[in-house]
Amino acid sequence: MDIRRTVLWMIFSFSLLLLWNNWQIHNGKPSLFGGPAPEAAATQQPKADANGTAASSTASIPSSPAAAPAAASVPGAAAPAAAKSEQVVITTDVLRLTFDSNGAQLIRAELLKYPSSSQSDKPTVLMDRSADLVYVAQTGVVGAPQGESFPTHQTPFHLVSSERSLTGDTLDVVFEAESGGLKVTKTYTLHRGRYDVDVRHAMANTGGAPLSPALYLQLERDGTDPAGTSSFYHTFTGVAVYSEQDKFQKVTFSDIEKKKGTYIKQADNGWIGIVQHYFATAWIPAQGKQRTNELLQVQQNLYAARTIEAVGTIAPGSSANVDAHLWVGPQDQKAMAAVAPGLELVVDYGWLTIIAKPLFTLMTWLHGLLGNWGWTIVALTVIIKAVFFPLAAASYRSMARMKQVAPRLQALKEKYGDDRQKLNQAMMEMYRTEKINPLGGCLPMVVQIPVFIALYWVLLASVEMRGAPWILWVHDLSVRDPFFILPAIMMATMFLQIKLNPTPPDPVQAKVMMIMPLVFGGMMFFFPAGLVLYWCVNNTLSIAQQWTITRNLERQAAAAANR
C-alpha cells in the first residue's frame, strides 16, 4: 500500500471539506463541525411605536420567582401608560451610553475606542433601539401585591443626578421611581477606562405592609446579525449562560424560538449575556444568591435573556440594596476575567481551545515586546517552526532521500506496470533498504493542521486583532487582504515547496499535489490577513529549511560518490 499517497489524499479531502463547510455556512446551512448556522435575519423587525422605538410588551416583564411566595404575575396586570421619556447621554473615556428615563434602561452603547467597521470615523454601536437594531439592557422589580405593580423597565423614572460626563475616576447616574409602595433608586456607576458598570438597586418600602419584591436583570436583542458579518465564515451571535455547575453554555436565537435551548435554569452563581463577534454584554448578579435564568422570545425577532432573584421581605420603613455588574464592551479576556469567573469564555476558540489559549497567551506576551500584531504573528511563526524543527528536519531529510531515489521508483513502475501489489511490495522493500519513511515527508503538514485551526480561531475571535495594522497595505489583520497579495504569495510558496519535493511516481498523485496550492490559496482569499500572514511566513521558513537540508544531503552524496 502507498501510504504517502493515502495521506496526500487525506489532506486534499480535508481541504475540500473545509471549502464545502464554508460554502454550507455561506448558504445559511449548519456547519459540518457542529457549529450552528448563522442566524438568518428575520424578515420582520420588532414592532416599533410612533417614535421608532421598540414597542413594550408585557411578555418582556417576568413573573417573580417561586422564592417570593407573595408575588403576583405582572404580565396579567395592565402595562403602565407610556410617558414622555427623556434620553440621557452619559460619556466616559471609553463609552457613550444613552439611557431612557422610561424604565431607566440602557438603549444605546457606543464604544469610543473601537471604530465602526463601515465608518472608521465613528465609534462602534454595540447596543441601540432603532429601526435597524433593537438591543437594550433593562431592569425592574416584580412581586407586587395583587392589583399593584412595582417599578419595571416600563415605568417612568426621573433623573436625580446632574453630571453627564466623566471628569474623575467614577460617575454615578441615578434614577428614581415609586410604585406599589416601593421606591426604587437605580444607580449606574461608570469607571474610567472600564467597560463594566456597577448597578445598584436601592428599594425602600414606603407603605404600611411588608413587601417581598424580586429583581430582574434583562437583555433584549433582535436576531439580526451584526453589521459587517461575513457571509463566508461563521461567528456566533446569541445568548451565553455561565455557571460553576454547567460552565459555559451557548444558545442560539433559533433554539430560543423553538424552546429547545439547553442552559441552567436555577443557580446561585454565574452570569447571563449576549455574545456577538468581538463584543458582548452580560449581567453579573451578586454571587451566592439563588436566582432563576430565563430565555424567551418576546415577539417576532425579539428575544430576552434575564435572571431573576428574590430580594426578601422588606418591612415598612425599611430598605434593601441589590448590587450587580453590567458588562458592555469588547471581548477583552483579561478585563473580563477580572469582573466575573468565566466571563472571558465568551471568546470561544472551539474544540481546540487547549491549543488556542496558550497560543493567545504567547501572542499577548510577544505583542508586549514588539508592539505590532503583524510582527507578533511573524515572531510566533518562527517559534512554532523552532518547536517543530526536529520533526520537520527529519521529514525534509526523508523527502530529500525520496527525491534521490525517484529514478529507481520510476524504474520499478515501468518494470511492474499495472501490477499494483508487486509494485507496492517492491517500493516498500526499497524504503526499508534505504531506511526511508514514505510517510515522513507529510508529517509536518499533518501535525500543523491542529495548530493552523487553533490559530485561525485565535485570529478570528480575538478582538485584539480587530483593526490591528501590520505594514503597507495591511491595515486590519482581522479581515481579508484587500489586494489579495498575501494569498498570492502563499500560493507561490506552496508551488515552490512542491517543486522542492520529489515528483510522485503516480500521475494522479502528482496532479493532486499541483492542485493543493490552488485549493488552499482559494480558501485564503476569504480568510483573515493575519492567518494568511502566518501561513506565508511558515511556508517561507519551510522552504529555506528544506532547501538547506537538501543541499547538505546532495553535498554529502556527491562527496560519498567521489570517494
Swiss-Prot record:
UniProt topology in membrane: Multi-pass membrane protein
Lineage: Bacteria, Pseudomonadati, Pseudomonadota, Betaproteobacteria, Burkholderiales
Protein known as: Membrane protein insertase YidC
Comp. bias (Low complexity): 54-70
Family, similarity comment: Belongs to the OXA1/ALB3/YidC family. Type 1 subfamily.
Subcellular location: Cell inner membrane
Function: Required for the insertion and/or proper folding and/or complex formation of integral membrane proteins into the membrane. Involved in integration of membrane proteins that insert both dependently and independently of the Sec translocase complex, as well as at least some lipoproteins. Aids folding of multispanning membrane proteins.
Gene giving rise to this polypeptide: yidC
Pfam family, one: 60KD_IMP
Ranges where the record places region Disordered: 36-70
Self-association and partners: Interacts with the Sec translocase complex via SecD. Specifically interacts with transmembrane segments of nascent integral membrane proteins during membrane integration.
One of the GO BP terms on file: protein transport
HAMAP family: YidC_type1
InterPro entries (UniProt xref): Membr_insert_YidC (IPR019998), Membr_insert_YidC_N (IPR028053), YidC/ALB3/OXA1/COX18 (IPR001708), YidC/Oxa/ALB_C (IPR028055), YidC_ALB_C (IPR047196), YidC_periplasmic_sf (IPR038221)
Membrane-spanning ranges: 6-26, 373-393, 443-463, 482-502, 512-532
GO molecular function: membrane insertase activity
UniProt keyword list: Cell inner membrane, Cell membrane, Chaperone, Membrane, Protein transport, Transmembrane, Transmembrane helix, Transport
Gene3D superfamilies: 2.70.98.90
GO CC field: plasma membrane
